[in-house]
Amino acid sequence: TLNISRANGSQREQYDQVEQYVALGYDAVCVNLVDRTNASSMVDLAQSEEVPLVFFNREPVREDILRGDHVYYVGTDARETARMQGEAVLQSYAASAEKMDKNGDGILQYVMLEGEMGHQDTILRSDYVLQTIEDGGVKLQKLDAETADWMRSRADAIMEQWIAEMGDEIELVLCNNDDMALGAAD
């Protein structure tokens, strides 16, 4: 049996749902945490009944994952994907700096489309892509950043607004995921 529940942003409601599934003897419980820093009580509950607990999308803090023998996280490595994006920018810049640096000031003026506000992947992807580019010797200047909540349609609307406001001042568009990048390109 597969049951899907929504916590509607409530950590308490989410805990109650996990508690119910553990009490019903489910083979495993998968959780998209409301608050990634507050998983320990769920881990302890599942551990006490030896029910595997699989977290996805929001990675619990490391200490919570290590609390149990059957606690897992499934997701991307946000740092690595950000480094890869930064390295792609560096490769493009090395191949054609004059095309990217439209105004020739030696600084890439950028805008960034970010995922969900406060989401660890948003924070890590934003920080690590910038760090990778700057560590690669390219100077950056932020023109603007907006939350598009991982959505292509929102990214498209934000990008249209930026183009209307800033036009050719934008030399680089950074996005926290592929869907928002597609929206920016639309």
Indicate where each model-derived feature is located.
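A residue-level marker of the well-folded mature domains of exported/periplasmic proteins
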Residues: 1-186
